[in-house]
């Protein structure tokens, strides 16, 4: 498809614009609880956000890990709808999801590739070369709800899941802070204490 066709398709997938639900994520997950979303659709990740927008609006989904692109690499027509850094960031912030982590993949310019570097898509692929230097090409953004914000009041079970997710993504200090400042979610003092002790050990291990 041309850039014009692809942009038109993405525009049609925005909430309320879909006529023929080709992807059908919205209908498929309509009655399925989605606690966390991981999206990697090779530059088409805005489809995920548009299709599951109701999940973000209702605060059902606690977090998102999504691929993002350095949008200006594309022509102006495509840039408005692809998963550029600014497009994804603004969309998630609109529903009070905050950025907690961002990883970047840098691409060394072709003129400098006469040396041997680490290829991220196999030794025979010379198009993508990951480097500590060079221009950021793409990456991943990790968003979570912050339950300390008034707009993000979540249930006891959701808070348990959120703390577990934060711990899984090596954000134990954030989980501890949420727990410390959201005591109303944990009526059981003993459970509260035990979870804090586990998180403290995780935090300490990161600084040894």
Sequence positions of predicted segments:
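Conserved acidic-Pro-Pro-aromatic motif
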Residues: 28, 32-173, 182
């Amino acid at each position: 498809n041309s850039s014009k066709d692809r942009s038109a398709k993405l525009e049609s997938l925005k909430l309320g614009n879909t006529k023929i639900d080709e992807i059908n994520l919205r209908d498929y997950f309509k009655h399925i609880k989605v606690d966390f979303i991981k999206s990697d659709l090779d530059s088409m990740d805005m489809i995920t956000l548009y299709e599951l927008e109701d999940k973000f609006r209702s605060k059902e989904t606690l977090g998102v890990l999504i691929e993002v692109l350095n949008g200006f690499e594309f022509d102006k027509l495509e840039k408005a709808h692809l998963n550029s850094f600014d497009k994804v960031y603004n969309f998630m912030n609109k529903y009070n999801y905050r950025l907690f982590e961002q990883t970047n993949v840098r691409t060394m310019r072709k003129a400098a590739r006469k040396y041997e570097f680490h290829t991220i898509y196999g030794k025979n692929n010379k198009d993508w070369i990951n480097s500590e230097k060079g221009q950021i090409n793409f990456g991943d953004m990790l968003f979570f709800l912050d339950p300390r914000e008034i707009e993000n009041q979540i249930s006891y079970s959701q808070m348990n899941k959120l703390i577990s997710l934060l711990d899984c993504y090596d954000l134990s200090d954030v989980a501890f802070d949420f727990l410390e400042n959201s005591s109303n979610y944990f009526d059981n003092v003993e459970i509260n204490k035990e979870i804090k002790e586990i998180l403290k050990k995780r935090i300490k291990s990161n600084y040894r």
